[in-house]
């Protein structure tokens, strides 16, 4: 039994058709362009034995079997048609991504995984000359408005629950939830910031264990989350009016910035995306690049900040899914206007996550 490699991308390079295997990064050039017309028919009729495949392709393309067999043998010689047993595990892995609706993400991953970054060597701006740096900037933040202390979650999340949240999240499900509890807000923020909380305490108290701990500090220490709620949240001991809040990750509390219904404002700030404020709440993840680069003095710092931002967003998305919310995320924000709206001081708006 033979069949085509499972994840092929067709490109034109210097006017010559090239099929690229995204899994292995192998490329296959076609000097005989006529062979390309056989590939769709082969894909529809494999896996199959060579002779059976030739008959099916000949029938599909209205050519004789000898011609079809010659094309198939040419593709085998190129390495595009391979024994089915050699790619069974690859097919199973790809099919999982297809079933979950993650095809675009899979293609982007394979297309970008081997990109080279032109960073300076670690000896420049890294650990070797950390002693010549001045002390890191103070990272203590001023207290904002009235703070609402959140109760630490009473449950722990089992690995199976987290995996279920990861596998079941979708980007385009409609919002269906009508109410939001303070327990759900607390749980998402608490578990989403476990590592960020640890690093923030270290940075705020300047409790670095060594120069290395300063030089290679995680960007999680420089991330903060602003919470925008679109309806009043009531519970036994209090209530939280709709408005904008800054999450104090160290104290696990929400500091009031401004009260009001900001659905329309948030949609405009998300460049007109109504879905950005159609849920029950929005998290705006921000980063203090200046503070972070004062500790990690390397050009990788900006990239690290963006990567850790996306990781925090993934935590929020997964935790929201665990709590039966549907989600939406976007980096498409009017940066300066959002910064002013949030009164974010040194924090730069980077990513927006909405759930409902």
Curated annotation (Swiss-Prot):
InterPro entries: Bacteriocin_Proc_Enz (IPR052544), Nitroreductase-like (IPR000415). CDD domains: McbC_SagB-like_oxidoreductase. It comes from the Bacteria. One of its GO terms (molecular function) is oxidoreductase activity. This is Trifolitoxin operon protein TfxC. It comes from Rhizobium leguminosarum bv. trifolii. The lineage of its organism: Bacteria, Pseudomonadati, Pseudomonadota, Alphaproteobacteria, Hyphomicrobiales.
């Amino acid at each position: 039994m033979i069949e085509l490699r499972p994840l092929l991308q067709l490109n034109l390079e210097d006017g010559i058709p090239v099929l690229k295997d995204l899994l292995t990064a192998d490329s296959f050039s076609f000097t005989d362009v006529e062979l390309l017309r056989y590939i769709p028919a082969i894909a529809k009729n494999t896996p199959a034995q060579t002779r059976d495949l030739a008959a099916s392709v000949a029938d599909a393309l209205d050519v004789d079997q000898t011609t079809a067999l010659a094309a198939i043998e040419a593709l085998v010689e190129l390495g595009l048609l391979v024994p089915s047993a050699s790619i069974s595990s690859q097919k199973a892995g790809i099919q999982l991504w297809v079933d979950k609706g993650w095809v675009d993400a899979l293609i982007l991953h394979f297309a970008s995984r081997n990109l080279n970054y032109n960073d300076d060597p670690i000896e420049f701006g890294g650990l070797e000359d950390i002693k010549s740096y001045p002390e890191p900037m103070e990272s203590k933040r001023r207290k904002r408005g009235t703070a609402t202390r959140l109760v630490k979650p009473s449950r722990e999340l089992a690995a199976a629950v987290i995996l279920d949240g990861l596998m079941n999240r979708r980007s385009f499900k409609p919002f269906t939830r009508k109410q939001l509890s303070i327990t759900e807000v607390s749980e998402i923020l608490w578990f989403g910031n476990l590592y960020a909380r640890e690093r923030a305490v270290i940075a705020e108290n300047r409790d670095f264990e060594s120069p290395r701990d300063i030089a290679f500090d995680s960007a999680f220490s420089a991330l903060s989350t602003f919470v925008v709620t679109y309806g009043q949240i009531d519970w036994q001991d209090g209530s939280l009016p709709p408005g904008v809040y800054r999450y104090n990750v160290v104290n696990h509390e929400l500091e009031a910035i401004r009260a009001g219904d900001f659905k329309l404002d948030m949609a405009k700030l998300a460049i007109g995306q109504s879905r950005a404020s159609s849920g029950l709440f929005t998290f705006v993840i921000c980063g203090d690049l200046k503070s972070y680069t004062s500790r990690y003095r390397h050009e990788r710092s900006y990239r690290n900040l963006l990567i850790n931002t996306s990781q925090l967003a993934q935590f929020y998305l997964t935790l929201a899914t665990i709590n039966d919310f549907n989600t939406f995320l976007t980096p498409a924000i009017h940066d300066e206007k959002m910064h002013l709206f949030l009164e974010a001081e040194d924090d730069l708006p980077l990513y927006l996550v909405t759930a409902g």
